[in-house]
Amino acid sequence: MARKKTTKRKVKKNVPLGIAHIHTTFNNTIVTITDLNGNAVTWSSAGALGFKGSRKSTPFAAQLAAEAVAKAAMEHGMVKVETFITGPGPGREAAIRSLQAAGLEITAIKDVTAVPHNGCRPPKPPRG
């Protein structure tokens, strides 16, 4: 019989400062918290929380995703967070409010959405 593979338990890093990356699309919201070097500490998304289809794109789903991430980050000792927001989705403001309500102190909010210099033609809803 094969031996059981021994795996190390995940070590909780003590990271007091971090960066919250909120990526919102028309279909989903992904919230990732990294340390200052860009190494992921924790992440969550509306889809990972069990929302399916059009419910993933709601502000409520984004709020729950941000709450889950904030709780996990605070377990790692995180207190202050800088926020980078990407994308045009409906969960932008809800995610920021949720991070703040969960107890993380937001030091800066930056919108880093990539704007094309007239690149590809977007799909039909954003064109209108």
Swiss-Prot record:
Gene3D superfamilies: Ribosomal protein S11. GO terms for biological process: translation. Located on the platform of the 30S subunit, it bridges several disparate RNA helices of the 16S rRNA. Forms part of the Shine-Dalgarno cleft in the 70S ribosome. The keyword Metal-binding does not apply. Belongs to the universal ribosomal protein uS11 family. This is Small ribosomal subunit protein uS11. PANTHER family: 40S RIBOSOMAL PROTEIN S14/30S RIBOSOMAL PROTEIN S11. Keywords: Ribonucleoprotein, Ribosomal protein, RNA-binding, rRNA-binding. The gene is rpsK. GO terms for cellular component: ribonucleoprotein complex; ribosome. The keyword Disulfide bond does not apply. Part of the 30S ribosomal subunit. Interacts with proteins S7 and S18. Binds to IF-3. GO terms for molecular function: rRNA binding; structural constituent of ribosome.
